[in-house]
């Protein structure tokens, strides 16, 4: 199925950025497009919107594709509070340029409580599972929406920024 979501990312300083995300499921993977206004968008191939397999920036950069070459993923034995999900990824740009360095990243998410998905957005059904994640100096609070198979980011914090994401629209096409 396919679905789209638009939200406003708000900073503590009152700055707002409207972001529109479109997802479709293909062969168990999420094909995702994030549009940051009219000029810039990112195409991604993801697992559950947690683990990135491929990304391409459109409207900025040289059109390279960042591909995940190796992924070491540790899934929790159950989705019980306190369990941990982690992924260590090794990525490379294609086509490669002489100045490119290989990239590595580690995502760690601690499983929190289960709660009704409608608390994230009124039209959602079923349950959501709270995830507290860290990756490359960013901490994020996410909700894994079981019916959609996707982890929506509700809040993200780094040493420089703090964003709270307010979902405006969420349309699911089944």
Predicted regions and their residues:
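Glycine-centered loop/turn motifs
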Residues: 1-4, 76, 80-88
């Amino acid at each position: 199925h396919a679905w789209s979501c638009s939200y406003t990312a708000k900073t503590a300083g009152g700055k707002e950025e409207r972001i529109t995300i479109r997802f479709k499921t293909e062969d168990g993977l999420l094909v995702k497009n994030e549009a940051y206004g009219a000029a810039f968008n990112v195409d991604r191939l993801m697992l559950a919107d947690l683990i990135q397999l491929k990304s391409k920036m459109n409207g900025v950069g040289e059109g390279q594709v960042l591909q995940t070459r190796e992924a070491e993923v540790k899934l929790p034995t159950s989705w019980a509070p306190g369990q941990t999900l982690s992924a260590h990824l090794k990525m490379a740009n294609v086509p490669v340029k002489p100045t490119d360095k290989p990239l590595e990243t580690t995502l760690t998410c601690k499983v929190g409580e289960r709660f009704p998905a409608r608390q994230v957005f009124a039209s959602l059904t079923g349950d959501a599972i709270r995830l507290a994640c860290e990756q490359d100096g960013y901490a994020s609070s996410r909700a894994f929406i079981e019916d959609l198979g996707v982890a929506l980011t509700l809040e993200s914090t780094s040493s420089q920024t703090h964003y709270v994401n307010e979902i405006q629209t969420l349309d699911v096409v089944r």
